[in-house]
């Protein structure tokens, strides 16, 4: 039987969008065996608690979600003194000081412990699944990211495919087979250049579920064939559920 992975990111407290994606997953012709959520389950909204509860209680016919931390989760942990830095600098720079209290009030303490328990990312088969990259959750990879930076993010974990969600975009960025030459220059000498063979690899942006009202995007992946499908689900009053597919071999 042909099994797929469903990979999504950025629910951002939007329960209706998450439900629309789950319903679309159930309608797929091929069964979805694994469900990965690459962070930003929450945002600074009280509805985030309902999303967490829904993730914690999958229905009998649904795959159990595997969830890792995203940018919003990291900001929440920082506020509670559980993050890797002491101050919510990024949160304040992006949204202002008022957002500190808004995020604090949105997520009850008992759910902070659930957020704290989440992994930083997953490595399955030859795939790294993570919100940003192995550098940080804030590392935003896009189709415009320089190739050498993309290659660095892949080679840090020796992954053939890196699935990420920080940008919110759906994209496939392929790196062809080749050679990378590097050298080290010190004050007194130059070390001979070293050549490293690079095999074909790719970075995949998995989309964003909850940011745009009425439209959710996510990714289906077939590990055996390396096939990728980008899915767009339109939902809401008067729309029912509509799905737009983009298949990439």
At which residue positions do the language-model features occur?
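His/acidic metal-ligating clusters that form di-metal
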Residues: 28-31, 104-176, 180
């Amino acid at each position: 039987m042909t099994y797929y992975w469903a990979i999504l990111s950025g629910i951002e407290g939007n329960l209706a969008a998450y439900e629309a994606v789950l319903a679309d997953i159930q309608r797929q012709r091929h069964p979805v065996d694994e469900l990965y959520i690459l962070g930003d389950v929450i945002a600074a909204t009280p509805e985030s608690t309902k999303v967490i509860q829904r993730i914690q209680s999958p229905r009998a016919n649904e795959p159990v979600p595997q969830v890792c931390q995203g940018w919003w989760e990291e900001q929440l942990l920082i506020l509670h003194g559980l993050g890797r830095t002491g101050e919510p600098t990024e949160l304040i720079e992006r949204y202002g000081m008022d957002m500190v209290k808004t995020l604090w009030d949105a997520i009850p303490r008992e759910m902070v412990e659930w957020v704290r328990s989440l992994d930083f990312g997953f490595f399955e088969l030859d795939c790294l699944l993570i919100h940003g990259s192995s550098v940080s959750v804030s590392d935003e990879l896009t189709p415009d990211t320089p190739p050498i930076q993309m290659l660095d993010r892949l080679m840090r974990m020796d992954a053939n495919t890196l699935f990420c969600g920080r940008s919110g975009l759906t994209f496939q960025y392929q790196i062809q087979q080749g050679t990378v030459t590097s050298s080290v220059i010190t004050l007194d000498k130059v070390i001979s250049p070293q050549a490293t063979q690079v095999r074909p690899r790719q970075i995949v942006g998995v989309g964003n579920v909850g940011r745009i009202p009425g439209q959710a995007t996510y990714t289906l992946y077939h590990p055996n064939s390396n096939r990728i499908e980008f899915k767009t689900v339109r939902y809401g009053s008067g729309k029912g559920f509509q799905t737009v597919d983009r298949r990439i071999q």
